[in-house]
Amino acid sequence: NKPAGKLPAQATSSKVSIDQSGNIARSIKSGTNVNSLLQSINEKQYCEIRKNNVKQSGNVSVGTGMQLCVINNNKVVKSYNIIVTGDTNGDGKTNITDLIAVKQSILGRSSLSNIQKQAADMNNDGKVNITDFIKVKAKILGRE
């Protein structure tokens, strides 16, 4: 049911922050499912959410590392890496696993990928530090 007319080359939204040059979709809350994310995209009828290049649907949780893809004639014309705030492990939730990952990164015991760092950067200051650790902890405890 794709409407006739000009096919979009990119995704836009007033609810999700979409970085066209960096190919990133962020400001997505943990616990968001595929249906609700697609509803927040203006070009939803042309978009898919994929994980490891497999289309996701319905109530599947959207996680960091999935892709928002704009589709034209069954081909991906633009793809955005999804960043779910607080979700470093890609399960779509912010939980103790994410808190431990942030702690280990701060202590230098493990490193996060660029996308994981962006998910862990809760205050969007470009760094992963104790402030982010406290914010992840507060989110888990329901104090955010």
Task: Name the predicted role of every residue range.
Residues 3-6, 14-31, 35-144:
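Cellulosome-associated attachment modules in secreted, modular CAZymes
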